[in-house]
Amino acid sequence: MERVILHSDLNNFYASVECLYNPSLRGKPVAVSGNPEARHGIVLAKNYAAKACGVATGNPLWMAKEKCPDIVFVPPHYDLYMKYSQIAQEIYSEYTDQVEPYGLDECWMDVTGSTHLFGDGKAIADKLRERIKFELGVTASVGVSYNKIFAKLGSDMKKPDATTVI
């Protein structure tokens, strides 16, 4: 039996969590960053609205503001990110015990032994995305393949909120 590997990437995770906890940020360009008043720091994460303006992770704050004058900078809240990451891990663990986290927002899962219970890899990926959206309020892109490299490639191919089989 060919292995079935999933890679889940929670889309714009830090910025998405910030928008959940501060609804006034929704629809605005948002970047999780250092302190803009201290005039130092970089963009740690951004949402799609900021990305559409050309803001990139790693940009100095002055550059992000230059590219996107309406951008809202928010400080990181790692306790919230950890909480949401843990909930996502618990969801993943309901489908397989072979979960390999990579940072707070990504992980690989070997669901080979779970397909007889939950359906093929695409069906499992779609269920995971649906549950993450419903239970966490964020979206995920999930790649499905026979190895980790191609599964990761799949999760990177279509964003946000997509399943890609390679």
What positions do the PLM features span?
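Gly/Gly-Pro- and Ser/Thr-rich, intrinsically disordered tail segments characteristic of DNA damage-repair
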Residues: 1-166
